[in-house]
Amino acid sequence: MIEKTVTVSTNMEARPAALFVQAASKFQSSVFVKIDDKQINAKSIMGMMSIGILGGQQVTLVADGSDEEAAIAELNKFFAV
């Protein structure tokens, strides 16, 4: 399992969230986004929209599986400043 904490550059609105979920779904690993005490399945559009990610927040990307390193590297691009 790999975890990486990043600072979000902009608000995660509908289109960016959909693109993020599409990217996360390409990986076999389980992928989650953690904010505070919430952990959301990164492959769920409803989950990603409900968590309300805002620019400037710190989130933790979590991946666990055979392609976890590739998943973290790819998904980090959506958040990094």
Regions found by a protein language model. Give the residues of each.
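Intrinsic-disorder/low-complexity, polar/charged segments enriched in Ser/Thr/Lys/Arg/Asp/Glu/Gln
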Residues: 1-5, 58-60
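C-terminal structural segments of small proteins and small subunits
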Residues: 49-81
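Compact, glycine-rich, soluble single-domain proteins
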Residues: 5-41, 46, 50-54
